[in-house]
Amino acid sequence: MIIVTGGAGMIGSNIVKALNDKGYTDILVVDNLKDGTKFVNLVDLDITDYMDKEDFIAGIVAGDDFGDIDAVFHEGACSSTTEWDGKYVMDNNYQYSKELLHFCLERQIPFLYASSAATYGMTDKFVEDRHYEGPLNVYGYSKFLFDQYVRRILPHAKSQICGFRYFNVYGPREGHKGGMASVAFHLNTQINNGEQPKLFEGSENFRRDFIYVGDVADVNLWFWENGVSGIFNCGTGNAESFQAVADAVVAYHQKGSVTYIPFPDKLKGRYQAFTQADTTQLRAAGYSRPFKTVAQGVREYMEWLNRKP
């Protein structure tokens, strides 16, 4: 059996799909379906069972027998960068991850988990090194601290531990994320609602490392299949502008022109104007597949979003 926590979320459900595509269906999805809309991410997927995240971790702590486990993909977390309840975030992201990690280590189960580019904060160099890490919010700190915890364990671990620092992920199965969904998702919605697509003023100068979620799932499966341990950036290594995203959405729809709105005061000084993964360590580990450009990935995403039932 394979366990995917956060399996009803965006990245988790895409990992389940990638596993299905390779013939794996004995999958336990762990999530919190308090937001019931997330169920739609699982409708077309084949899984064996579902567990609530609280029931699951209680079983982990109690040492329950989950049978033979081939791997754990730990994607579940509070991913809101605007959540400031530190106790909740640290319990949910840090303590939960530690309990699950030790369960896997004791049983020599491969453990692959979601870290984040939020571990870096305001920097122009995104290298997997303590020198460049300085999270700006408690979410980023929870991910940073778990990475630090893993770094101390890695030299002595007898089974795989692999963390991925996700950059700006976009693509299918993110509709439940609301305001946290990607710019491509929101621009598509605006055009379909008959509105002009909107960007912040200066968006041609805001450049992020946008990575298609299908590529993220592929990275996860490749590292699992090859048994590689470590903490790796998961981005394309090529920053592109928000304007490029908008251009790709408009090109797909063949209508609409971008309207520019003032940059909000509340984001000034708290907004990463630039992110770009250093992929040196990812490539050195042996992952050599190309990543989709914004033009390629957004088109594929638009085709999925606007598919006819």
From Swiss-Prot:
> What is the documented function of this protein?
Catalyzes the interconversion between ADP-D-glycero-beta-D-manno-heptose and ADP-L-glycero-beta-D-manno-heptose via an epimerization at carbon 6 of the heptose.
What family, per the record? Answer: Belongs to the NAD(P)-dependent epimerase/dehydratase family. HldD subfamily.
Q: Which SUPFAM superfamilies match?
A: NAD(P)-binding Rossmann-fold domains (SSF51735)
Q: Which cofactor does it need?
A: NADP(+)
Residues engaged in binding NADP(+): 10-11, 31-32, 38, 53, 75-79, 92, 143, 169, 177
Reproduce the free-text note on domains from the UniProt record: Contains a large N-terminal NADP-binding domain, and a smaller C-terminal substrate-binding domain.
Q: What's the Enzyme Commission number for this chain?
A: 5.1.3.20
Give the pathway listed in the UniProt entry for this protein.
Nucleotide-sugar biosynthesis; ADP-L-glycero-beta-D-manno-heptose biosynthesis; ADP-L-glycero-beta-D-manno-heptose from D-glycero-beta-D-manno-heptose 7-phosphate: step 4/4
Q: Spell out the subunit comment.
A: Homopentamer.
Query: What catalytic activity does the UniProt entry give for this protein?
Result: ADP-D-glycero-beta-D-manno-heptose = ADP-L-glycero-beta-D-manno-heptose
Organism listed in the record = Edwardsiella ictaluri (strain 93-146)
Q: What is this protein called?
A: ADP-L-glycero-D-manno-heptose-6-epimerase
Q: Which GO MF terms are attached to this record?
A: ADP-glyceromanno-heptose 6-epimerase activity; NADP binding
Q: Which UniProt keywords apply?
A: Carbohydrate metabolism, Isomerase, NADP
Primary enzyme class: isomerase
Q: Where is the active site?
A: Y139, K177
- Cofactor: record remark: Binds 1 NADP(+) per subunit.
> Gene symbol?
hldD
Write out the GO biological process terms: ADP-L-glycero-beta-D-manno-heptose biosynthetic process; carbohydrate metabolic process
Where is substrate annotated to bind? N168, G179, H186, F200, E201, G202, S203, R208, Y271
